[in-house]
């Protein structure tokens, strides 16, 4: 990894065979980068999704640097909206921008940032461009502890239900975490229901 150099630890996540990679960020000895498995959603259907979700929800890192494939934007943005809902500062780095431009396509980074409610920047992992800048933006977001305000909203009925769940069930939880848990309870997510001791048929 270019940004961590050779100072990297590779092992497995506890209890599973999914590889775990961690390293210190070049020029920032106090910054540890944890490379999570590549996923498209926080729904725990695959082992990779379970590992990534458990880490994000349980460990609550200071910031999430979400690498997005610019050539397949729509598929990647579903995860980004879920990450913003976690209440953890998010920086979305749109990768393969060189390919996007070569294909004659355009991505309005400023508008995307507004729509997602998080910082968005361009990178090309292949050419090594924008990576240091993305890391610096992530550090800045972590240090400022920017409050994430999800821009994605549901229909009025669903939003009303989510507000009711937050008030009735999640009032003791930090405000920034309530929306994600409310959505998962609304979806009848088995792992969240079990964690919150909520009967499945309630």
Description of each model-found segment:
Residues 23-29, 51-121:
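Conserved C-terminal guanine-recognition region of P-loop GTPase G domains, centered on the G4
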Residues 3-4, 56, 68, 138, ...:
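Hydrophobic aliphatic residues
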Residues 35, 95, 124:
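Active-site glycine-centered loops adjacent to acidic/histidine catalytic or metal-binding residues
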Residues 117, 144-202:
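Extended helical scaffolds that flank P-loop GTPase cores
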């Amino acid at each position: 990894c270019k940004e961590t150099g050779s100072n990297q630890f590779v092992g497995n996540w506890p209890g599973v065979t999914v590889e775990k990679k961690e390293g210190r960020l070049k020029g920032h000895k106090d910054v540890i980068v944890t490379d999570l498995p590549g996923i498209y959603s926080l729904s725990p259907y695959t082992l990779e999704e379970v590992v990534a979700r458990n880490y994000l929800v349980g460990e609550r890192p200071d910031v999430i640097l979400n690498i997005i494939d610019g050539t397949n934007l729509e598929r990647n943005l579903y995860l980004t909206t879920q990450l913003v809902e976690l209440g953890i500062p998010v920086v979305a780095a749109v990768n393969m921008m060189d390919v996007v431009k070569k294909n004659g396509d355009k991505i309005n980074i400023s508008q995307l940032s507004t729509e997602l409610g998080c910082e968005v920047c361009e990178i090309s992992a292949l050419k090594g461009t924008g990576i240091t800048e993305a890391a610096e933006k992530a550090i800045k977001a972590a240090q400022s502890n920017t409050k994430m305000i999800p821009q994605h909203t549901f229909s009025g009925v669903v939003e009303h239900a989510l507000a009711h769940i937050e008030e009735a069930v999640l009032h003791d939880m930090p405000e920034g975490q309530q929306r994600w848990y409310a959505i998962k309870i609304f979806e009848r997510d088995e792992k969240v229901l079990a964690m919150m001791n909520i009967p499945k048929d309630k």
